[in-house]
Amino acid sequence: MLLHLILILKSFLPKRNLAFRYDIVALSLTRKILLKHQPPENVFAALYIDSLHGGRHQIMPGFCKLSCPTLDVGPGLGRFAASHFSERVSQDRQAQGRERRSVLLPQERRGSSGRQPLYSLLPHRPKREGVIGAALCYTSASHSLSPAALLPPVGRGKDRRCGRQVGAAGLLRHVGRRRQFAQLTRGPLGLPCALLEPLPLDPHLLDKGRDVGVGGCHDHQGQEDGLLLHGGPEPVLGPQGVIGPAYGRPHANVHALRHELQHGPLGDPPRLRSG
């Protein structure tokens, strides 16, 4: 009933205020997915909010058949929303088509062909890029994502590297990655860390029966190695006791995780407390 009331009130809004109209539809769809927590097989649902792109929100299906995970940033709410609100999305697409030049101008300047890598979903630079929030719901489709898909761009100008280029250059650590997952788990939707399933990143570790992902290091037999990273400022419990506050982040392997817990990332003081 509340959703119908919102849609009725939204119809009286001016068509130029597309950001607020998309906000209601996207948040309602994401809320349904997260509350049910049983999305269809091989579906990746994500809410993408970017003030630089006119506040457009995208709800997209999974990337089960794509070798390189990408995000469609074309006009409208995407195929997932179109299947639920076909009339509303068609009307909004017509209204947004008249504003296509102003809405898509920042993306066209960057030379994009209308598709954007997966790292654009993550608020790795909230102040610089204008990202105000994101909510991700991982399913079995996320197991096929490569580690390079979660790496943000590094460098400026001609030295700017993305995806696999970052991994090949050894630039696996990023300044904003610790804040990135902290904001992800404390987003505008109040998404708890429990909803973020472990995302396998290293296939060699998967062969040994271990997952390394957003939540840290997990064992398929249900045993934790004592180095589990949480998505919030809670203290991390390790073999030596309380190590200190940490934030969940993707890691290439267990050795990098242990080394970072002992010595800290580049530019940060050590977080290991001896004794």
Curated annotation (Swiss-Prot):
<comment type="similarity">
    <text>Belongs to the 'phage' integrase family.</text>
</comment>
<dbReference type="GO" id="GO:0046718">
    <property type="term" value="P:symbiont entry into host cell"/>
</dbReference>
<feature type="compositionally biased region" description="Basic and acidic residues">
    <location>
        <begin position="88"/>
        <end position="111"/>
    </location>
</feature>
<keyword id="KW-1160">Virus entry into host cell</keyword>
<dbReference type="GO" id="GO:0015074">
    <property type="term" value="P:DNA integration"/>
</dbReference>
<keyword id="KW-0229">DNA integration</keyword>
<protein>
    <recommendedName>
        <fullName>Integrase homolog</fullName>
    </recommendedName>
</protein>
<comment type="function">
    <text>Integrase-recombinase proteins are responsible for catalyzing strand exchange between DNA molecules and play an important role in the DNA replication.</text>
</comment>
<keyword id="KW-1179">Viral genome integration</keyword>
<dbReference type="GO" id="GO:0044826">
    <property type="term" value="P:viral genome integration into host DNA"/>
</dbReference>
<feature type="region of interest" description="Disordered">
    <location>
        <begin position="88"/>
        <end position="120"/>
    </location>
</feature>
<comment type="function">
    <text>May be required for the formation of concatameric complex replicative intermediates and/or their resolution before encapsidation.</text>
</comment>
<dbReference type="GO" id="GO:0006310">
    <property type="term" value="P:DNA recombination"/>
</dbReference>
<keyword id="KW-0233">DNA recombination</keyword>
<dbReference type="GO" id="GO:0075713">
    <property type="term" value="P:establishment of integrated proviral latency"/>
</dbReference>
